[in-house]
Amino acid sequence: NKLDEPYMKKFKFLKFSKSKKLRYSHNYFKERLYLVFLPGFMSDIEGKKPMCLLKFAKKKKLGFLSLEYSGHGKSSGFFTKGNISIWSNEAKAMIKKIIKKNNFILIGSSMGSWIALNQFKYFNSQIKGFIGIGSAPEFLKRLMWDKFPKKIKREIVTKGKAVIKNGKYEYPISYQLIKNGRENRVLNRKYNLKINVTMIHGKKDEVVPVSFSRLVLSKFIKAKKKLVL
């Protein structure tokens, strides 16, 4: 399933240091509202969601930005060396560099919603809306660690990581990732922005329960809220 050539040209790399470069796609406008898509755990920017959003942004003459965190897709780095703090900081740096002072709507998919919630403390005045798709903030504790059998937990602690099988997927889960997740609590805060917040969640989602999206909505006190199932 080869991507359309025009889209391939939209992928660029931003160099952060000698050893770190992140791949991103964007639709540039100097002074326009942007859509910022933050992908999920082990996802890249060649999936259907970022592609559809890029197409939509072009059609509506909106700015667009999506990135691959380190250890994801074609970005540099090792997945097992990354964590929520690192990936959140990469998203922050990319937004500052590409979007600058423009306003934007955050769109987070799965783990991307966790990364998105971490952006509110930096871009409160620029964020004009938030859309979550199958949102999974704090999933490392709630959906992984708390449910792992003792044997897996022991392996992660003693060896530093373990490969977790989930259906046809395999995830290398490191102990530093789990520990860092505990430092990135976002569901113990309240968000005071008067913006539109929409959570989209599949009723048949077997990985992330709908309760996660409801919980995210409950944290926005002054927002105009909507849950789409």
Question: Which role fits each region the language model picked out?
Answer:
Residues 50, 195, 209-218:
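Short alpha-helix in the alpha/beta-hydrolase fold that links the catalytic acid
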Residues 50, 54-76:
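Conserved alpha/beta-hydrolase
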Residues 73-98:
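Catalytic nucleophile-loop/oxyanion-hole region of alpha/beta-hydrolase
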Residues 125-173:
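Hydrolase active-site cap/lid region
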Residues 193, 199-201, 205:
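Short beta-strand/loop motif that positions the catalytic acidic residue
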Residues 218-229:
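Catalytic histidine neighborhood in serine/cysteine hydrolases
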